[in-house]
Amino acid sequence: MSDQNLGQGSDEPEREEPIVRDKRRIDPETGKVREPQDLSHEELVDVGPAGESQGEEILSDDDLDLLSGQTTADQLAADQLAADQLAAERLADLQRVTAEYANYRKRTESNREIERERAIGDAVKGLIPVLDDLERADTHGDLIEGSAFATIAAKLRASVERLGLLPYGEKGEPFDPQIHEAIFQQPTPGVTADTVADVVETGYRLGSTTVRVAKVVVAVPA
């Protein structure tokens, strides 16, 4: 009985260990494509579900994942480059618009100041003859300190100065044809350059604008 059992046990075929072959074309550790190796016909040809051989090698899921990951990284790099270029263009546009706006503000403020000075100049031009009369009265001693007339004159002068109207032209200063009008030239010994010898009519400035030039007598070298 025992011999029969032994005989039956010896007739069973020995079980073969399964052979595992890594057919992935891309090395999962390095990410590089593997070089083709010399394989037997059985290893080169895969049998399809219906038993028919397929000449094309099918990529495994791991290979597809690696390829997909590489494609995604390349796409992300391309998208990032495009985003950086777009950001640089938008920044350049913003800088250009900012510069244009700054220049516009400067022009506007400059024009506004010019118009302001022009408007004030038109208003105070009518007061300049009054200021001339006050100056003559002061020269002749008619503005007695403490009198009502002197008080009014002081207030008027202070008001026009607050508006920015300032007198100019003094005896002894260099003659400048841009701001002085020479009504007479007087040869003077010892004078080496044209100099204001006397101020006949005071000049007035409003900011950078000359409202009226000063009329002067010029001392010239003899």
Curated annotation (Swiss-Prot):
Species of the source: Leifsonia xyli subsp. xyli (strain CTCB07)
Protein family: Belongs to the GrpE family.
Location of this chain's protein in the cell: Cytoplasm
Gene name tied to this protein: grpE
GO molecular function, one term: adenyl-nucleotide exchange factor activity
Keyword Manganese: no
UniProt key word Chaperone: yes
Annotated protein name in UniProt: Protein GrpE
Keywords for this protein: Chaperone, Cytoplasm, Stress response
Biased composition (Acidic residues): 54-64
Basic and acidic residues bias locations: 16-44
InterPro entries, per database record: GrpE (IPR000740), GrpE_coiled_coil (IPR013805), GrpE_head (IPR009012)
Domain of life: Bacteria
A Pfam short name: GrpE
